[in-house]
Regions:
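Juxtamembrane intracellular "pre-TM" segments in multi-pass secondary transporters
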Residues: 21-39, 236-275, 470
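Short amphipathic helix-loop junctions that connect adjacent transmembrane helices
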Residues: 53-76, 289-309
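A membrane-interface helix-boundary motif in multi-pass transporters
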Residues: 72-75, 195-222, 366-367, 427-446
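Helix-to-loop junctions at the C-terminal end of transmembrane segments
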Residues: 92-106, 319-333, 429
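Cytoplasmic membrane-interface "Motif A"-like loop-to-helix N-cap segments
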Residues: 101-117, 329-344
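C-terminal ends and interior cores of transmembrane alpha-helices
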Residues: 115-132, 342-365
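Hydrophobic core of transmembrane alpha-helices in multi-pass small-molecule transporters
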Residues: 121, 133-152, 279, 362-385
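Multi-pass alpha-helical transporter architecture, strongest
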Residues: 126, 223-234, 354, 439-470
Length: 470
């Protein structure tokens, strides 16, 4: 069916999916940007940067793809397939785990449990020594941590409707992403001055067997855990739904399918958006997952230079997320996402075409370093708004009390195709024999996501989703 299939036209403007009144479990002060619940909620994003920025983007995966683990090309391929495998697990399990935390009144509990598991797996990366036989252990730990991180993210994203109103949901979502980027800056600075290029000598600066880099994993685990705590006290738990909470695990899939059918009948563009965002979000994730790897392997950045770039990139991304959040509340999330995807395609193409050599472009002489700094930072500028507006788009359409399940579907549809970017990244390297060409795989996914999104209606023109409670 086309996404533009005729739908019944109401005689009055379509209402927003969520009324501007508190729903059960909504935190006191919801909607105010600097309120206690919003700050506590955003603290989780701040802490999660230790996993996103330090572990999976700019430090630990860069470490995993060095020559110590058998060569950058081989290690990049193993990492790509490892993350693709993690995506399959998330695709099958995320919506039901979200549904069960909604129905059982355990959204906050499972956010805490999954966050703890991420911290433990991150800490275990300390035992990944710089030898080829440890590559699969390192990839397995990072991949499994990604699984539980996504499960935690389902519950975390679902809380957005508890701390915001329809008029503030875009800027609060953007504020959360910005807090994550700024948290990433602080974490990366600490990693740089304490472990990678220490300003004083201590046992954590010892480079024997890459002890300093392995200790970064311990630091990241503790950082994430510490900043994940505030949300557990500031945002109330959602109420338990007695009847649907009694469903067994496999019976939950039956309820899930009934709800998806009901949402499709009442608000088909909600489903269309889930499918479109699945594609482009996979490309967004790949920009960060493989950005540091490309900086080091293709453009010759040292680990210290990668971290300095990451600090600058997170600052630019934070500005983009905040600006995009305010634009979201005024112009709508779809416009923000489309503009961001076009910007990403332009910047990514420039990185690919210009590459690490010296070229003349737009009347200037571009070296590899200049190319990556200019267009790499341009990439980070557009990632934040696309991520924040995608979350805000779905939160506007979520049926009250079923946010966790819908964000579970959000994770599942994303992870159902999450093998695309890692697989195309790995395949492009295999075909062309050079890490640089992995960028082609990422660009293909971003372009496909943009094309699938264009026919999807913005939230203001979409009927609210209605789904059965059990």
């Amino acid at each position: 069916m086309s996404v533009d299939s005729p739908q019944p036209v109401p005689s009055h403007p379509l209402p927003t999916a969520r009324p501007e009144v508190p729903t059960p479990g909504t935190a006191a002060g919801a909607g105010r940007l600097l309120s206690r619940p919003v700050l506590a909620w955003a603290s989780w994003d701040w802490g999660s940067a230790a996993f996103n920025a330090v572990m999976t983007t700019f430090v630990f995966t860069v470490y995993l793809t060095t020559d110590a683990f058998g060569g950058e090309d081989r290690a990049s391929v193993v990492l790509g397939w490892g993350l693709a495998t993690a995506g399959v697990l998330i695709a099958f399990l995320a919506p039901v785990t979200g549904q069960r935390s909604d129905n059982g009144g355990r959204r906050k509990l499972w956010l805490g449990v999954n966050s703890l598991l991420v911290a433990v797996l991150t800490g275990l990366c300390f035992f990944v020594f710089p030898r080829p036989e440890f590559l699969f252990l390192g990839v397995a730990l990072i991949a499994l941590a990604n699984v539980f991180f996504e499960f935690a993210g389902v519950n975390y994203n679902a809380m957005l409707t508890q701390i915001s109103t329809p008029r503030s949901i875009g800027r609060i979502s953007g504020f959360g992403w910005a807090m994550g980027y700024v948290g990433g800056i602080v974490a990366l600075v600490l990693v740089l001055v304490a472990f990678v290029e220490p300003i004083f000598t201590w046992f954590g600066s010892d480079t024997t067997d890459s002890l300093n880099i392995r200790l970064v994993a311990v630091f990241s685990a503790l950082w994430f855990l510490a900043f994940a705590v505030p949300v557990m006290f500031a945002v109330p738990e959602v109420p338990r739904k007695a009847k649907s909470a009694q469903l067994g695990f496999f019976a939950s899939y039956g309820l899930l399918f009934r709800r998806v059918k009901a949402i499709y009948r009442t608000s088909p563009h909600t489903i269309f958006f889930l499918l479109a965002s699945a594609v482009f979000r996979d490309g967004l994730a790949a920009v960060f997952t493989f950005g540091g790897i490309i900086a080091a392997g293709t453009f010759g950045f040292t680990l210290s230079e990668v971290i300095v770039f990451a600090i600058a990139g997170n600052l630019i991304a934070a500005v983009g997320a905040v600006g995009g959040g305010f634009l979201d509340d005024r112009a709508g999330p779809k416009r923000v996402i489309v503009i961001s995807l076009i910007g990403l395609l332009i910047a990514g193409s420039a990185v690919l075409i210009l590459g690490p050599g010296t070229h003349e472009f737009l009347g200037f002489i571009w070296t590899g370093d200049t190319t990556f700094w200019v267009f790499g930072l341009m990439l980070t500028l557009f990632v934040g708004p696309a991520q924040a507006s995608s979350r805000a788009y779905l939160a506007r359409l979520a049926p009250a009390g079923q946010e966790g399940e819908l964000f579970g579907l959000y994770a599942t549809t994303g992870r159902a195709v999450s093998f695309l970017a890692p697989a195309l990244f790995a395949t492009s390297i295999t075909i062309f024999g050079e890490q640089r060409y992995g960028i082609i795989g990422i660009l293909v996914v971003l372009l496909a996501g943009l094309l699938v999104l264009l026919p999807v209606k913005p939230p203001a023109k979409v009927a609210p989703a209605v789904a059965p409670s059990y």
